[in-house]
């Protein structure tokens, strides 16, 4: 599914989002995809950029016009450029495995995205490896994989299954169980969270690698990396620094950081400055970025059992080998594409709901301020008009 990104002039390098064709200001133009709204610059410039785009759309809604038919015209008037298919060109959705699709659905706690079977899970099964246990040699040995996946991860599966029968978590999918049992670090982690998160983290980790992986990321993913880290080498340095400074057991992640549009007392919601960025984060023990509302794209396991048989205490060698020889950048790019689409759809819904609420409130206040006596009592007329608006 194609999607468009609207970027305020000056916000990003023109080379990153240069338009491939001139904008059409025809009112008949129809755009079926959702949009990311981001004005360039900061402070007043960012706010005014959004208002230039959203205000005409609000006017169209008042006149009963289609919002989608006005988007390109409003973008042109607001001095905003467009670019289609930033991430999804060259990626075949049909090649994504069912496990990856389920993984992304659970990453959002999206109950509706799973199958009926997923929605009524009463027993967690260990997922198979996406490749033979010796496929990552010589960088990760068969012995390490068999111990790591076959013993350590299996322990989490067995212990979690011993806890969920007859509990409040019975019937939940793995992702739902993990998110519902997270206690925000206020006390020791709930055992169900620890085991559910470790199972999820490990499945995500195994699918972050592939035989013959590593190298440079695909072009479109590289554009995001260059934008948010300055360069591929800059991203690698930050990832290595996070791994070297993670005290004890834990994980390092490359994430797509999203945040909901804040509710502000202004005419339009303003995205946060960190909206839609790639970030490196680290987490202790079993914590993962899902509990922060971020979309993980890449993970490396920093528990000692993940690397000690092959690298002993040379954690930095393990991390650099992971990045240079094992990472499946195609998988990372596919995850990024789906994370962007989810964020677009979510924030389009939040923004539309916010605007509609304000429009209804304004219409309601106008009706009450100027009741019209047509037939019957003015108060009855006002009440009838409010009901017609659904307020």
Curated annotation (Swiss-Prot):
Keywords: Chloroplast, Iron, Metal-binding, Oxidoreductase, Plastid, Transit peptide
GO molecular function: metal ion binding; superoxide dismutase activity
Transit peptide stretch: 1-73
UniProt-annotated binding residues for Fe cation: 148, 202, 301, 305
Listed GO CC annotations: chloroplast nucleoid
Disulphide linkage map: none
Record text on cofactor binding: Binds 1 Fe cation per subunit.
Catalysed reactions, as listed in the record: 2 superoxide + 2 H(+) = H2O2 + O2
Record InterPro entries: Mn/Fe_SOD, Mn/Fe_SOD_BS, Mn/Fe_SOD_C, Mn/Fe_SOD_N, Mn/Fe_SOD_N_sf, SOD_C_sf
EC code: 1.15.1.1
Superkingdom of source: Eukaryota
Cofactor: Fe cation
Entry annotated with the keyword Transit peptide: yes
Residue ranges with Polar residues bias: 381-391
PROSITE patterns with a match to the protein in the record: SOD_MN
Bias (Acidic residues) ranges: 87-119
Assembly and interaction partners: Homodimer.
Main function: Destroys superoxide anion radicals which are normally produced within the cells and which are toxic to biological systems.
Similarity field: Belongs to the iron/manganese superoxide dismutase family.
Designated name of the protein: Superoxide dismutase [Fe] 1, chloroplastic
Upper lineage: Eukaryota, Viridiplantae, Streptophyta, Embryophyta, Tracheophyta
């Amino acid at each position: 599914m194609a999607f468009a990104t609207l970027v305020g002039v000056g916000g990003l390098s023109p080379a990153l989002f240069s338009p491939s064709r001139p904008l059409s200001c025809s009112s008949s133009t129809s755009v079926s995809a959702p949009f990311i709204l981001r004005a360039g610059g900061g402070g007043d410039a960012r706010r005014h950029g959004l208002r230039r785009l959203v205000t005409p759309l609000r006017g169209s809604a008042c006149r009963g016009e289609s919002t989608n038919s006005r988007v390109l015209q409003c973008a042109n008037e607001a001095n905003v450029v467009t670019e289609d298919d930033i991430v999804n060109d060259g990626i075949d959705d049909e090649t994504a495995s069912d496990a990856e699709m389920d993984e992304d659905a659970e990453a959002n706690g999206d109950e509706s995205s799973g199958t009926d079977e997923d929605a009524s899970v009463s027993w967690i099964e260990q997922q198979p490896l996406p490749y033979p246990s010796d496929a990552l040699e010589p960088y990760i040995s068969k012995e390490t994989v068999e111990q790591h996946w076959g013993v350590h991860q299996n322990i989490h599966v067995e212990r979690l299954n011993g806890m969920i029968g007859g509990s409040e978590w019975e019937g939940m999918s793995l992702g739902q169980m993990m998110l519902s049992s997270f206690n925000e670090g206020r006390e020791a982690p709930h055992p169900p969270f620890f085991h559910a998160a470790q199972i999820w983290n490990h499945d995500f980790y195994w699918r972050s690698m592939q035989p013959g992986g590593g190298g440079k990321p695909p072009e479109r993913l590289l554009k995001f990396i260059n934008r948010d880290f300055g360069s591929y080498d800059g991203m690698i340095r930050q990832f290595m620094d996070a791994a070297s400074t993670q005290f004890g057991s834990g994980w390092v992640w490359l994430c797509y950081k999203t945040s909901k549009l804040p509710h502000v007392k202004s005419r339009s919601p303003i995205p946060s400055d960190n909206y839609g960025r790639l970030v490196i984060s680290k987490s202790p023990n079993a914590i993962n970025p899902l509990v922060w509302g971020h979309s993980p794209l890449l993970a490396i396991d920093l528990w000692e059992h993940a690397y000690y048989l092959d690298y002993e205490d040379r954690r930095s060698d393990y991390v650099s080998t992971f990045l240079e020889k094992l990472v499946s950048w195609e998988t990372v790019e596919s995850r990024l594409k789906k994370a962007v689409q989810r964020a677009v759809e979510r924030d389009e819904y939040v923004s539309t709901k916010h605007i509609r609420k304000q429009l209804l409130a304004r219409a309601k206040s106008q009706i009450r301020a100027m009741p019209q006596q047509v037939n019957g009592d003015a108060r009855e007329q006002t009440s009838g008009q409010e009901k017609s608006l659904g307020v």
